[in-house]
Design a protein with these regions (language model features):
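A Rossmann-like FAD-binding core segment of flavoenzymes
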Residues: 1-90
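Mid-to-C-terminal Rossmann-like scaffold of FAD/NAD(P)H-dependent oxidoreductases
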Residues: 108-204
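A short, polar/charged loop-to-alpha-helix boundary motif
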Residues: 204-222
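FAD-site-proximal beta/loop scaffold in flavoenzymes
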Residues: 49-51, 56-131, 222-226
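Short beta-strand-to-turn element immediately C-terminal to the catalytic PLP-Schiff-base lysine
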Residues: 77, 189, 201-202, 213-216
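A short, glycine/Asx- and small/polar-enriched loop/turn
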Residues: 42-48, 98-100, 152-153
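Generic alpha-helical structural signal
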Residues: 18-21, 123, 127, 208-211
Length: 227
């Protein structure tokens, strides 16, 4: 059951989400998108009933919640540190809070209105803070690569950089092999020289190559679609 219009909406576009849904449903798993649960009550044909805002419902014997993260900022809030509107301890580029003697890293820290729900940004913050505590004010936290590579119920899924082409002038190259069940989208710069992001579903064999092009700013070949 997914609240958004598609699965993994942050990582995938509409085409990638549709293919992922198709592959999961082929495994015999029902997928319900655009469903907002309003109440969980006792079921008639199963133990539980999930009631949705569109007045439909789903009965099941077991419900497993996977609802993201919530920053644990109670101590910081009680101590008078600056807290974001939706939670999280506000930090600067050196992981320092509103009190110069207090620092925060990881999923409790709010950097430029962003909470990072992955472990990699926490490691980057830790390195930044370690450098700052050792007198290095040149090293700064400037964000983190949120690229993702995983298997979802056995289905390869990959997302790199600006996967939704939000960069001004960005162009798209799409490959959609319906028979093989492979989808790949490459987001490139307006001049065609830089890979800005990518989406892969069904086949991650190109992921590592595309990731290196995106992270290291490697100039794309004349025909990027050959990657």
């Amino acid at each position: 059951v997914e609240f958004a219009p598609r699965l993994m909406p942050v990582q995938l576009d509409a085409d990638g989400g549709a293919l992922l849904r198709h592959k999961i449903e082929e495994l015999g798993v029902q997928v319900h998108t655009e469903k907002a649960t309003t109440a969980i009550t006792e079921g008639e044909d199963a133990r539980l009933r999930m009631n949705f805002s569109d007045e439909s419902f789903l009965e099941t014997d077991l419900i497993v919640f996977s609802a993201g993260i919530r920053p644990q900022d109670a101590l910081a809030r009680a101590s008078g540190l600056e807290i974001g509107e939706r939670g999280g301890i506000v930090i600067d580029n050196h992981c320092t809070t509103s009190d110069p003697h207090v620092h925060a890293i990881g999923e409790c820290a709010l950097w430029e209105q962003k909470i990072f729900g992955l472990v990699a940004p926490g490691y980057t913050m830790a390195r930044t803070l370690s450098a700052a505590l050792n007198g290095d004010q040149e090293t700064a936290f400037t964000g983190a690569d949120m690229s993702t590579k995983l298997k979802l119920l056995g289905v390869d899924v990959g997302s790199i950089g600006d996967a939704h082409a939000q960069t001004p002038g960005a162009r798209n190259i799409r490959f959609n092999d319906e028979q093989a069940g492979h989808y790949r989208r490459m987001v490139i710069s307006e001049d065609g020289k830089t890979l800005l992001g990518a989406i892969l579903v069904g086949d991650n064999s190109h992921y590592d190559t595309l990731l290196q092009y995106a992270l290291n700013g490697i100039t794309l070949p004349e025909n990027p679609e050959t990657l």
